[in-house]
Amino acid sequence: MFYLIYKEKGISSFKAIKDFAWQNNIKKIGHSGTLDPEATGLLLLASDEDTKLLDYVDKKFKSYRATMILGLQSQSFDSQGKIINSSNLKVDNLTIEKTIKNFVGPFVQIPPIFSAKKINGKRAYEYARQGSEISMKAQEVFVKSIEIEKIDFPKVIFKAKVSRGTYIRSLINQIGLELKTYALMDDLERIELSGLSKNDLGVVSDLDIIDLEVLSLEKHEILTLAKGQKFSKDLADGKYAFIYKNTKKILGICKIESKIIAPIKIFNKKIEKSLKKDEKNE
C-alpha cells in the first residue's frame, strides 16, 4: 500500500518513517524522497510489494512553502548553518517580486555543500563537516511556478513548484545574490508531491500516483506474465503498469516492444489476491 504522511519539524525523515512502520506493524517500507530534519511536510511511503513501484511514481514536480530571510548568508544556505555574510541593503517589495518571478523556468543551480548529494560514494555534508574542500557540480533544474504570499522585509514567504533535484535553499541563496544582497532559508514545508496534498493524508491509491499508462489485462494474460513469459499485444512501445480487468490495484509493470509484451516487475501476492477475489465474485 501507499501512504501519505506529514513529517513534523525536528525529527529526521527516517525516524518519522520508522515510527509510522512500527505503529502500523509494517515490516517492509520505502519512501519516494526525504526531508531535512528542520523541514516539515509530506512524505510518500510504500509498504510490502508496492515498494517496487516507487521507481515509477510521478516525481516530476514538488511544491514547497518557504520562508526567506534577506541580508544573511550561511554555509548551509539556511538558518541552521554558520553565518558567513551579511548586508544591510534594503530592497523594495517590487524589486523582490520581480526578481523572484524571474526564476520561473529553467536555470542552472549549484547544490548546497551541506546536502545529501552523493560525491564519490559519500554525502556532501560528510565532506563539509570534515572541512574538506569539494566542488559541487552545477545542474539544470526547473521552476514551474512561484507565488509570493507575504513580504515583510527582511522576511519573504513564497510557494514554489519545482522539478526533482531542485534545492530550495540554493534557489533562495541565488535570489539573494540576484538582489545584490544575501538570503537564507528560515523555514520549509513540502505541500505537494506526486499530485497529492495534505487533503490526501492516509492511504493513497497507486493509480493516482503512477507515472505510467495503465493497461487492463485478462486473467490468462496476467498469468502468462507472472510466469515470466511474453505474448503479442498490439500497443505502442513503452512501459506500462497493468491491472486485472477494472480492479484498482496495480499488479505489475511490463514493457512492449514491437508489439510483444514482456514482464518487468510482477507482484505475485497481489495477483493471487485479485484473482481469488474475482473467482469468489463469479
Curated annotation (Swiss-Prot):
This enzyme's EC code(s): 5.4.99.25
Organism encoding this protein: Mycoplasmopsis pulmonis (strain UAB CTIP)
Protein name listed in UniProt: tRNA pseudouridine synthase B
Matching Pfam families: TruB_N
GO molecular function: RNA binding; tRNA pseudouridine(55) synthase activity
Lineage: Bacteria, Bacillati, Mycoplasmatota, Mycoplasmoidales, Metamycoplasmataceae
Record-stated family: Belongs to the pseudouridine synthase TruB family. Type 1 subfamily.
Reactions performed catalytically: uridine(55) in tRNA = pseudouridine(55) in tRNA
InterPro entries (alphabetical): PsdUridine_synth_cat_dom_sf, PsdUridine_synth_N, tRNA_psdUridine_synth_TruB
Function: Responsible for synthesis of pseudouridine from uracil-55 in the psi GC loop of transfer RNAs.
